[in-house]
């Protein structure tokens, strides 16, 4: 898989037996600023059980809370989440990041779970 970033929080990778961690994806410029911009790419091998979570900062940013702490918290929630039902997993992650609070920014969450070839 090839990934690029336009300044969003790092995607979080979960691998069976290897743990859960944010991926280092060098950020490019915000989309729309420079039509000729180059975006650095990061390649990640897909293995059965691989899970990748991508989100906008609106999901995890909270005034007065360090962004690195928020990323670490989301990483911990993903590490503990049951992956048998992605809808329920997404609901769990959204709830864990403060679904009850007023959001001040857009929220987007994408979860990819690669089961392997059939």
Where are these regions (language model features)?
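Conserved subregion of the PPM/PP2C metallophosphatase catalytic domain
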Residues: 1-118
């Amino acid at each position: 898989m090839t990934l690029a970033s336009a300044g969003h929080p790092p995607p979080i990778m979960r691998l069976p037996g290897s743990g859960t961690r944010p991926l280092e994806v060098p950020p490019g410029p915000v989309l729309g600023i420079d039509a000729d911009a180059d975006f650095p790419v990061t390649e990640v091998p897909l293995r059965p059980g691989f899970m990748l979570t991508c989100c906008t900062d609106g999901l995890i940013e909270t005034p007065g809370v360090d962004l690195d702490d928020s990323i670490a918290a989301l990483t911990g929630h993903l590490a503990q989440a049951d992956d048998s039902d992605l809808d329920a997993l997404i609901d769990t992650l959204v709830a864990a990041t403060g679904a009850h609070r007023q959001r001040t920014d857009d929220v987007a969450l994408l979860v990819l779970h690669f089961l392997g070839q059939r």
